[in-house]
């Protein structure tokens, strides 16, 4: 592969990242440094890139875009937190009934990467009471260029292999006055509405 040779002599676009294979994304990811903790600040749009399996892709796209309640737009970060146990925190952006809403919060810190042990920017969802926290979702963020980050998403006990996505921005400042329409995810589980009507594997529901 020659992906790492391309980094210094070009500006990447989201479309170019989408055209890379899973193996090429992994090679590229391993070659990158972490984003600096204090510099990832504000709201970013996001695009899913690749999943390790076809089943993972189908389930992932249904979870993010097909539950009938929301459409995932991206993430937002602040390098500080009112909670002394967190170094930083953030939220996910969704479009619901034509409006942008914020939920699925996370805590952020620097930690050893699950991929190669390098120090990396990490998002942990388990400190908050939301679905992503219930499956112990952990994301990592690495710096590709000034407006673009390459990221992995993991969940469940096995964690690996990860999903790949990218973040581009920041496009807006962090919204410190978010209203948390489904609950603040601190004392009680967030009540995000969803439907299983479009679940991609309906035969599995019959066996429950």
Q: Where would I find each of the regions flagged by the language model?
A:
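Soluble ligand-binding/transfer domains with enclosed cavities or grooves
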Residues: 2-208
């Amino acid at each position: 592969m020659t992906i790492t040779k391309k980094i210094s002599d070009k500006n990447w676009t989201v479309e170019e990242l989408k055209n890379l294979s899973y193996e090429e994304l992994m090679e590229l990811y391993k070659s990158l440094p972490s984003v600096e903790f204090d510099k990832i600040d504000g709201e970013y749009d996001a695009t899913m890139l690749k999943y390790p399996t076809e089943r993972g892709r189908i389930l992932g796209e249904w979870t993010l875009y097909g539950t009938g309640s929301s459409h995932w737009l991206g993430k937002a970060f602040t390098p500080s937190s009112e909670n002394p146990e967190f170094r930083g925190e953030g939220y996910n952006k969704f479009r619901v009934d034509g409006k942008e809403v914020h939920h699925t919060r996370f805590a952020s810190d620097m930690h050893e990467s699950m991929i190669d042990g390098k120090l990396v920017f990490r998002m942990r969802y388990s400190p908050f009471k939301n679905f992503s926290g219930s499956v112990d979702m952990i994301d990592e963020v690495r710096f590709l260029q000034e407006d673009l980050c390459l990221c992995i998403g993991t969940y469940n006990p096995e964690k690996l292999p990860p999903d790949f996505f990218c973040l581009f921005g920041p496009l807006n400042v962090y919204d410190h006055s978010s209203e948390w329409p489904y609950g603040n995810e601190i004392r009680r589980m967030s009540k995000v509405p969803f439907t299983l009507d479009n679940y991609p594997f309906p035969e599995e529901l019959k066996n429950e």
